[in-house]
């Protein structure tokens, strides 16, 4: 299965918006990759706002 580009949007404790781009086979994997890349998201998964491609 080819990888697709996803944008994962999230906010921090100060309500500042951030985005990270990931290549993954689906949106679930993109979110999991984002959690691996940004440890803050692993601790606070509810701060993830969206995942689009």
Label each region the model flagged:
Residues 1-18:
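Short aromatic-glycine-(Arg/Gly/Cys) micro-motifs in beta-strand/loop hairpins
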Residues 15-29:
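A short, exposed loop/beta-hairpin motif centered on an aromatic-Gly-Thr core
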Residues 32-53:
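Short, mixed-charge low-complexity intrinsically disordered segments
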């Amino acid at each position: 299965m080819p990888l697709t580009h996803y944008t994962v949007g999230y906010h921090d404790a100060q309500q500042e918006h951030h985005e990270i781009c990931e290549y993954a086979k689906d949106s679930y994997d993109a979110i999991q990759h984002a959690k691996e890349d940004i440890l803050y998201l692993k601790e606070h998964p509810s701060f993830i706002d969206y995942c689009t491609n």
